[in-house]
Amino acid sequence: MTLLALGINHKTAPVSLRERVTFSPDTIGEALDNLLQHPLVKGGVVLSTCNRTELYLSVEQQDNLYEQLIGWLCEYHQLNPRELKSSIYWHCDNEAVSHLMRVASGLDSLVLGEPQILGQVKKAFAESQHSHSLSSELERLFQKSFSVAKRIRTETEIGSNAVSVAFAACTLARQIFESLSELNILLVGAGETIELAARHLREHRVHHMMIANRTKEKAQVLADEVQAEVITLPEIDIRLAEADIVISSTASPLPIIGKGMVERALKLRRNQPMLLVDIAVPRDIEPDVEKLNNVYLYSVDDLQAIIQQNLAQRKAAAVQAECIVQQESRYFMDWLRSQSAVNSIREYRNQAEQMRAEMAAKALTAINQGADVEQAINQLTHQLMNRLIHAPTKSLQQAASNGDLERLNLLRDSLGLEHN
């Protein structure tokens, strides 16, 4: 059995190609069914995200499969093979195992060490389970990859340092305040950065969030997801005093939160400290706000400094993580190779049992028909011996006649014979 991983990702293909090779959640089951109709494909998993589309397969053999699988992808997505061939990568066995472990651990991600990919890999695995498309080898590989990703998170610092603006803003808030769960947080805007920040805060059990946006309708979708309250931009002036933390990211050409607005909020708060994180360009918060006592204002440049420092730390952690992947992929390949022996042993035992049953049935028939018992037993054991040693005898003769001493000694070892 051979394991394969093939696909395209953000490193090998532009978004204009990646978007044409994606599988939507409702088509993955159908695609797997279609893929497993190939006589050599015994199991499959389809991983499709905005940054990658990959097939993980267990196959009987890989001869001529490269062209056939690319052809299948192109036919399924109505692409010209020339468009795909220059962007596709192809990994076998140990390389395929290492690749999946790196993907699941975030080592192959656009943002090094990002945790979301593990959830996406688990979802792809679950879809394959649901479609009954998993082979035992693939099931073992994916389960092992999940444990490797967990080990890497536990033993390295790969995921402990924020490397996106949204995560850096949330990390900064957690560093300044001992606990976020009871704080009031105001998010200004409803774009991608604020969406990421809101989800990240929700994961850290923040229960009191307000989302201020120019249009309530867009903000309401996000608010429903993270259980937040929606307010309009003009309402910020009235509600700002409630906020312990403000994270702002809009496309406004002018500041939304001015020094006077913050001063009024501080007065109502009786000068309780406020953290304001402005990740908008142009800035949403007037820079003079920084001059106020009990106000901590951070700009996108401040966060970029944190991100660069954290990215360097992640890269150092990635070296350690790669060593773990190499070690675990070797362990997995040892197991996979041992499965070949297990299957061979099982097949050999079944063959021997079939011979024994046939010989025993013949002997019993002869005895029931009046044959001498001792003679029947001797004949049974003689015939059984001849049938069992027939194949090894031919192999020994062939190795000897070919002068293949290495094979001859290997056969003698396997038969428990001493070397000459």
UniProtKB/Swiss-Prot annotation:
Query: What EC class is this?
Result: oxidoreductase
**PROSITE patterns in the cross-refs:** GLUTR
What is the reaction catalyzed? (S)-4-amino-5-oxopentanoate + tRNA(Glu) + NADP(+) = L-glutamyl-tRNA(Glu) + NADPH + H(+)
Q: What is its EC number?
A: 1.2.1.70
GO BP:
protoporphyrinogen IX biosynthetic process from glutamate
Residues that coordinate or bind substrate = T49, C50, N51, R52, S109, E114, P115, Q116, Q120
Task: Keyword check for Translocase, yes or no.
Answer: no
GO terms for MF: glutamyl-tRNA reductase activity; NADP binding
Annotated site location: Important for activity: H99
* Highest taxon listed in the record's lineage: Bacteria
- Presence of keyword Endoplasmic reticulum: no
Active site, UniProt feature? C50
Q: By its UniProt entry, which Pfam families does this protein fall under?
A: GlutR_dimer, GlutR_N, Shikimate_DH
The protein's annotated pathway:
Porphyrin-containing compound metabolism; protoporphyrin-IX biosynthesis; 5-aminolevulinate from L-glutamyl-tRNA(Glu): step 1/2
What keywords are annotated for this sequence in UniProt?
A: NADP, Oxidoreductase, Porphyrin biosynthesis
Fetch the InterPro entries from UniProt.
4pyrrol_synth_GluRdtase, 4pyrrol_synth_GluRdtase_dimer, 4pyrrol_synth_GluRdtase_N, GluRdtase_CS, GluRdtase_dimer_dom_sf, GluRdtase_N_sf, NAD(P)-bd_dom_sf, Shikm_DH/Glu-tRNA_Rdtase
What PANTHER family does the annotation carry? GLUTAMYL-TRNA REDUCTASE
Query: Could you say which protein family the record assigns here?
Result: Belongs to the glutamyl-tRNA reductase family.
Q: What else is known?
A: During catalysis, the active site Cys acts as a nucleophile attacking the alpha-carbonyl group of tRNA-bound glutamate with the formation of a thioester intermediate between enzyme and glutamate, and the concomitant release of tRNA(Glu). The thioester intermediate is finally reduced by direct hydride transfer from NADPH, to form the product GSA.
Domain comment, as recorded: Possesses an unusual extended V-shaped dimeric structure with each monomer consisting of three distinct domains arranged along a curved 'spinal' alpha-helix. The N-terminal catalytic domain specifically recognizes the glutamate moiety of the substrate. The second domain is the NADPH-binding domain, and the third C-terminal domain is responsible for dimerization.
- What does the UniProt record say this protein does? Catalyzes the NADPH-dependent reduction of glutamyl-tRNA(Glu) to glutamate 1-semialdehyde (GSA).
Task: Please describe the quaternary structure of this protein.
Answer: Homodimer.
Q: What is this protein called?
A: Glutamyl-tRNA reductase
Which species is this UniProt entry from?
A: Photorhabdus laumondii subsp. laumondii (strain DSM 15139 / CIP 105565 / TT01)
